Structure formats: C-alpha cells, structure tokens
C-alpha cells in the first residue's frame, strides 16, 4: 500500500507565483490539471481540514504526487492548462468531447474563383466566411448562392479541362467561366463580388446595386437582363424574410446559453456573423460528479476557444450569463492574444443581445431534456435486451456487416455501442482483399481476424457480438473468434441477425451459436436496439463500399495498361478532368498530356475503347 501524500512538506516548496499544477494517482496517471494566480494559495485550499466539495475530497484521496509549472502570467497559465488537459484527459477535469473543426465557405484565389466548403487549416489562398455550425448549413448556403449568383463550384481540375459548358450551366446554376465566349472576366468578377457582399451580410448594398442595374437595363430595352436582375432581387428578399438579421452591429458574436441538470451540462452556442444568425450547436462536456456550474463553464470556455487556434473562429464579442462571469479577465486576455485583436465579453446584455441569450439558454435546457429522454430510451432498450438474453450487464456491443456489389470492392464494418448508444469514434472499416469475389464467409473471417487477433484492453472486450447474417455467417464468425478468446476474462455472446423472407424490419430471426432461433415482437425495445446497431453497421459498410467502388471505377480502366503507372494515371486524369473526359478524347488530345508520347497515346486510346 502506498503511503498517503505528504501535503505539508509539499506545500513548503510551492511558490506564490502563477502557474499550472498536475496531480497524479498511485499509478502515475494524471487525474487533475489546474491553474492558479497564486500556486501556494490555490494548492493549500485542497488540503484544508474542512472541504465542502465531494469532488475535491475524492480527488485529494487519490493524490500521490503533484507537479508544478511556474508561468510568467495568469494568461500563460490558462493556455498551458488547456494544453495539459488536452494531452492527459484527466479523470477529474471537465472534458469537452466535441473537438470537431467547423466548416467555412471559401471563395478561392483563382482567376475565376470557385465557391466551396472548407474544413481544417486555412492554407489555401482565398477568402473564408464562417464558421458555420455544421456542413448542412454550408451546403444550404451554397445551394442558395448557386441559384442567385451562379459562381462555379466545380473542382479546378474539371474547370481547366472543359471546352464547352457543363450541365450546371444548362440549368442556370453556373455562369460558365470555363468558356470565355459565355461570360467576360469583368462580368464574372462582378458576380463573385455580389457573393462576397452577400456572405459579409451586406444584403442592402447588393440589393441597391442590383436595382440600379435593373433600371439601367430596362431603360436600355435590355429586358432579358432586367428580368434576370429582378429575379435575383426577389430571391434575396425571400432569403431576408427567412433569415433573421440582427439589428445589432456587424460584429461577429457567439451567444453562450447554459443549463445543467441531472449530471448533464449543455452549452448551446448561437453563432452570429456579420449580423446574421448562421445556426447553433449544443455541446455536452464530460463532467465529473458534483462539479459546480462555474467550473464546468470556465473549463468549456478555455477548451472550446483555445482548441480552435485559427483566429477567425474567435468572435469579437461573446455573450454569456452574468452568474457565470466569475473571473473573465484571464480568458479574455488569452483569447485576445490568440485572436490578435480585442475580444469583448458581455454579461448583462439588453435588447437584441438579451433576446439571443434568452433563446440560447432555452435551447440549452431543451437539449438536456432531449438528451435525458434519449438516454432513458437507450437505458430501457439495454434493460430489455439484458432481460431477453438473461445477462447481468451489457457494457459494450459490436456488430459486423459486409458490403459489396457482385463481389466488387468488398468492405467490412464494425460498429460499437455502449450503454449511451453509438460510440462513433470507435467505428471501423476493413478493406477486404485476397478473397474470391462474393465470398461473404471469407470476408467476415478476415474482418474478425483483424479485429480480435491483437491484444484487447479488458474494457474493449464486447459483451455481445452481432453478425449481420444467418447460421453460416455466425458459425464462421464463432470459429474465428474462438481462437482468440482463451485469454479473455469474459466470453461474449454471439448472435446472428437473419433477415426475414420479405426483409422487412420487425421480421428478423435471431440465431445463437447453439443453433437456437427466436423472434422478438416488432414493438419490443430489445429488438429496436438490435435493429439500431444492425442498421448502423449496414450503413457504415455501404458508405465505405460506395467510396471504394467509386474510386476503383475511376481508375481501374487505366491500371491494366502497360506503360501507364500511378504518376501517368494521375497526370492523365488531372489534365483531362476525369476518366469520362479521357475516354472521349482523341489520340492527339491524349498525346498533349505531359509525359505521354504519341505511341503510348494510341495504346491508351485503344485500351479505353475496348
């Protein structure tokens, strides 16, 4: 047994300067990371005789060692604390689980700019607008812009190899800058300028210019042009009716609503950019028991904004609840430093800002209610499945499925559920190779070999393994897994899910490795859980298969041609703008591709015609 932590001796060595501390347990695992303006004062508070917080008492009872890092300023300590939390994911810290990047709309720096969605680092030349709360909001905006201002959205490789306009031009969704006779550079630049103003929220400026153009065109008897401008004006006005525009300034704002109930905390962020509400997103940080609202919110603020190190993701203004604004100066300084400009916090908003905050708080509470109801449904389904199978507990389930088209591009999927539902970060796909096309038994065997042949952590061993298939698939799966579970502390139950004759949901037959077959009522919660994990596995496999099949079909026609390796294949597809364009090309056109001789062009031409 390890001796108790000697806090008295330790505290004698601690400075009064700002810094970060890391607390370790007996296994040398970091269990908590904190920051302090005065390290001595903050660390002493953990070891007082009377500590009210249950969480703090539990934390202190597990401390075996504390490391301290002194910093120059409190702001520096805040940033270092965030980096340590991200590195160690300590048990007693509030952890923000949603660390996805936010999408932007990009107007590229091309001569004829392209409009597209962008995620990740902003390395490409061009102008970025956003962030948007999700890809759906970006796609909706791009679709809308395509109808009002038909700026091209095709890839540069496709654009550069076109000699005539594509279908998007024919249906009025692209101005056709790839063909110089259709639209001049000046006209296209004007179109891009309208898009830029629209994305900046300057709708009135766009309307004013379009109205002027419509009137001029009408006076000059260019009625077709006047009608086009009229349609654009009407479309923008319809958008304005649907999109609430803030009366507030044109500053970017995030409005942070907060709610915490039944051990669940939610921060609902309403994103406002250039006066327009782009959308919102709810975040549910992982919180230890008995964590105060203030600690949850402070931890979220730091992790959320410092995780997105691109300055444009930090708005000029952040609106939040007064009761959660304990000590904002360090985080305000840190965010201003990262953003390279002043970031303002507003804690007692009135007018439009106050209404936004009230709306965000309501949405946060609604999101918690929805999550609790969903959790109750999942819990009920797990309980029903436990009772159906006579199991004491179910902590983890995995399900496998195979997808292919007539044996082509076979993909296996594995999805994972715990008692909160799908664990999507643990979903896996397996690219199946070296088997006879269409041999599902061999495909399943290969996937299971790759999944279970390596050493598994105890918590990663499933309680149930579902196989989407009948007796044959299940028996093959059992043969494979039985080779590896000898050293496992528990053996999973294996169940096959066979579709009914009509393949309708609710008519599934469940099969055990003993050969027992049984059905559940179509309204049984246990069956709904099985259908859920089966459908997740099926969809995950199909998505992977379609992507692989598409890639194979784009390149396979070139792979068998002697003298055409990966570099030449890439050059051909890039120069021509795709496989279909290459198939339509003449020998002379193919010979223009860098690195392709006339004789090789003839070989390629003949091979593609077969």
Swiss-Prot record:
Keyword terms: Cytoplasm, DNA damage, DNA excision, DNA repair, Excision nuclease, SOS response
Domain UVR positions: 204-239
SMART domains: GIYc, HhH1
NCBIfam families in the cross-refs: PRK00558.1-5 (NF001824), uvrC (TIGR00194)
Occurrences of domain GIY-YIG (ranges): 16-94
The protein's name: UvrABC system protein C
Origin species: Vibrio parahaemolyticus serotype O3:K6 (strain RIMD 2210633)
InterPro entries (alphabetical): GIY-YIG_endonuc, GIY-YIG_endonuc_sf, GIY-YIG_UvrC_Cho, Hlx-hairpin-Hlx_DNA-bd_motif, RuvA_2-like, UVR_dom, UVR_dom_sf, UvrABC_protein_C
């Amino acid at each position: 047994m390890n001796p108790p932590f000697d806090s008295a001796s330790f505290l004698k060595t601690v400075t009064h300067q700002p810094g970060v501390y890391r607390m370790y347990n007996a296994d040398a695992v970091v269990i908590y990371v904190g920051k302090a303006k005065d390290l001595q004062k903050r660390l002493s508070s953990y070891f007082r005789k009377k500590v009210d917080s249950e969480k703090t008492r539990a934390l202190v009872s597990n401390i075996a060692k504390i490391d301290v890092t002194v910093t120059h300023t409190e702001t520096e300590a805040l940033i270092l604390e965030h980096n340590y939390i991200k590195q160690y994911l300590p048990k007693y810290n509030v952890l923000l689980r949603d660390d996805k990047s936010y999408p932007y709309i990009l107007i590229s720096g091309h001569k004829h700019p392209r409009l597209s969605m962008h995620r990740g680092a902003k390395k490409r030349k061009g102008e970025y607008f956003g962030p948007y709360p999700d890809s759906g909001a970006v796609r909706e905006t791009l679709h809308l812009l395509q109808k009002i201002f038909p700026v091209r959205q095709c890839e540069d490789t496709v654009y550069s190899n076109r000699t005539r306009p594509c279908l998007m031009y024919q249906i009025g969704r692209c101005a056709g800058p790839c063909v110089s006779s259709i639209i001049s550079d000046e006209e296209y630049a004007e179109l891009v300028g309208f898009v830029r103003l629209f994305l900046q929220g300057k709708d009135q400026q766009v309307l004013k210019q379009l109205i002027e153009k419509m009137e001029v065109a009408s006076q000059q008897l260019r009625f077709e042009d006047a009608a086009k401008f009229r349609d654009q004006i009407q479309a923008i006005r319809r958008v304005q009716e649907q999109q609430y525009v803030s009366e507030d300034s044109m500053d970017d704002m995030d409005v942070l609503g907060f709610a915490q109930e039944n051990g669940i905390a939610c921060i609902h962020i309403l994103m406002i950019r250039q006066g327009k509400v782009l959308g919102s997103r709810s975040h549910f940080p992982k919180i230890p028991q008995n964590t105060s609202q203030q600690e949850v919110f402070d931890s979220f603020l730091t992790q959320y904004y410092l995780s997105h190190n691109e300055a444009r993701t930090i708005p000029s203004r952040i609106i939040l609840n007064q009761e959660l604004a304990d000590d904002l100066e360090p985080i305000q300084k840190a965010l201003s430093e990262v953003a390279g400009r002043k970031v303002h916090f507003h804690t007692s908003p009135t007018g439009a800002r106050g209404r936004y905050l009230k709306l965000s708080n309501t949405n946060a509470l609604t999101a918690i209610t929805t999550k609790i109801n969903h959790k109750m449904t999942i819990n009920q389904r797990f309980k029903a499945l436990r009772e159906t199978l006579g199991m004491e507990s179910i902590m983890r389930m995995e399900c496998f499925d195979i997808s292919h088209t007539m044996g082509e591009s076979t993909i296996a999927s594995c999805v994972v559920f715990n008692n909160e539902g799908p664990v999507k970060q643990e979903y896996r796909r397996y690219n199946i190779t070296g088997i006879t096309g269409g041999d599902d038994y061999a495909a399943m065997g290969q996937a299971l070999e790759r999944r279970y042949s390596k050493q598994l952590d105890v918590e990663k061993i499933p309680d149930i393994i579902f196989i989407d298939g009948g007796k044959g698939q299940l028996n093959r799966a059992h043969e494979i897994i039985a080779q590896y579970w000898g050293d496992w502390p528990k053996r999973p139950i294996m169940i096959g899910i066979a579709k009914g004759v009509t393949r309708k949901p609710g008519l599934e037959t469940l099969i055990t490795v003993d050969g027992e077959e049984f059905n559940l009522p179509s309204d049984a919660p246990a069956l709904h859980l099985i259908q859920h994990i089966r459908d997740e596995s099926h969809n995950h496999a199909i998505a992977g298969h379609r992507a692989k099949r598409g890639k194979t079909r784009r390149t396979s026609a070139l792979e068998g041609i002697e003298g055409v390796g990966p570099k030449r294949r890439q050059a051909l597809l890039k120069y021509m703008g795709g496989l279909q364009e290459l198939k339509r090309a003449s020998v002379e056109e193919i010979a223009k591709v860098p690195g392709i001789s006339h004789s090789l062009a003839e070989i390629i031409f003949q091979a593609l015609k077969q």
